[in-house]
Amino acid sequence: MFPRSGLGLAVAAAVVAYLVLLLAQQLYMSNSSQCTIVITGESVSVVGCVYSEAFIELVKGLKPYYHPLG
């Protein structure tokens, strides 16, 4: 693919390093939990959150979105 020159080896090493870092980032992001709150017209969903007393106080008043038609 590349001739055996310093530039070709440097490009190949940079591509390999980029792919390794990209894989490490994907593994790190998939292991970390994400707190997601989805409010629709029908329900409120809380997924992946740490339920501390302060968090419960913040979200206990959430209600589905109401928008009258017409």
From Swiss-Prot:
Keyword terms: Host endoplasmic reticulum, Host membrane, Membrane, Transmembrane, Transmembrane helix, Transport, Viral movement protein
Location(s), subcellular: Host endoplasmic reticulum membrane
Family: Belongs to the Tymovirales TGBp3 protein family.
Annotated function: Plays a role in viral cell-to-cell propagation, by facilitating genome transport to neighboring plant cells through plasmosdesmata. May induce the formation of granular vesicles derived from the Endoplasmic reticulum, which align on actin filaments.
Pfam families in the record: TGBp3 (PF02495)
Cytoplasmic side: 26-70
Keyword flag Transmembrane helix: yes
Entry keyword NAD: no
Protein name (database record): Movement protein TGBp3
GO biological process, one term: transport of virus in host, cell to cell
One CC-aspect GO term: membrane
InterPro entries in the cross-refs: TGBp3
Membrane-spanning parts: 5-25
Species per Swiss-Prot/TrEMBL record: Apple stem pitting virus (isolate PA66) (ASPV)
Lumenal side: 1-4
More info: TGBp1, TGBp2 and TGBp3 seem to act together for cell-to-cell propagation. TGBp1 is the main movement protein that physically cross the plasmodesma with the viral genome. TGBp2 and TGBp3 would facilitate TGBp1 function.
